[in-house]
Amino acid sequence: MVDKGVKIKVDYIGKLESGDVFDTSIEEVAKEAGIYAPDREYEPLEFVVGEGQLIQGFEEAVLDMEVGDEKTVKIPAEKAYGNRNEMLIQKIPRDAFKEADFEPEEGMVILAEGIPATITEVTDNEVTLDFNHELAGKDLVFTIKIIEVVE
């Protein structure tokens, strides 16, 4: 039985409430969903339960499962990537991009001082950056299968 402190391997499919797959450890599922990344290794995810390596709701979901068990759980935003934080949205002068080797465009993801940010608005004078995680504020649905307890 899975408990805190136990190292396990799981296969998973992560979906938005709409049913759109945003992440998976299963290559065929990634291809079917149109999110396949050729340089990624699709294999069971290995982690120690309770060490905070994954989102809280995922770690809680695997507790008391057994090898071979599979279940689908809905994880509320507050136990996933958190609720959206308006303090993480910043307007900066468009002039700040003068030295950049690109033109800022809505929807573009950039690294601002090493932190990913999505450009949500571009005007003549300002660029709005959103530093919230792309899944912040979203309830997630995971199908999780316990593959192995690692000794």
From Swiss-Prot:
Pfam families xrefs: FKBP_C (PF00254)
Biological-process GO terms, alphabetical: protein refolding
Keywords associated with the record: Chaperone, Cytoplasm, Isomerase, Rotamase
Temperature notes for this entry: Thermostable.
Gene Ontology MF: a single term: peptidyl-prolyl cis-trans isomerase activity
Region listing for IF, in residue ranges: 83-132
GO cellular component: cytoplasm
Catalytic reactions on record: [protein]-peptidylproline (omega=180) = [protein]-peptidylproline (omega=0)
Effect of residue 23 to V: 69% of wild-type PPIase activity and 78% of wild-type chaperone activity. Loss of both PPIase and chaperone activities
InterPro entries per record: PPIase_dom_sf (IPR046357), PPIase_FKBP_dom (IPR001179)
Record-annotated disulphide pairs: none
Domain PPIase FKBP-type span(s) in chain numbering: 8-109
Compartment(s) of residence: Cytoplasm
EC number, UniProt record: 5.2.1.8
Enzyme class: isomerase
Activity regulation, short description: Inhibited by FK506 but not by cyclosporine.
Main location: cytoplasm
Family to which the UniProt record says this protein belongs: Belongs to the FKBP-type PPIase family.
Annotated domain remarks: Contains an N-terminal PPIase domain and an IF (Insert in the Flap) domain. The IF domain, formed by an insert in the flap loop, is required for the chaperone-like activity but not for the PPIase activity.
Function: Catalyzes the cis-trans isomerization of peptidyl prolyl bonds and accelerates protein folding. Also exhibits chaperone-like activity. In vitro, can use oligopeptides such as N-succinyl-Ala-Leu-Pro-Phe-p-nitroanilide and N-succinyl-Ala-Ala-Pro-Phe-p-nitroanilide as substrates.
Protein name: Short-type peptidyl-prolyl cis-trans isomerase
Species classification: Archaea, Methanobacteriati, Methanobacteriota, Methanomada group, Methanococci
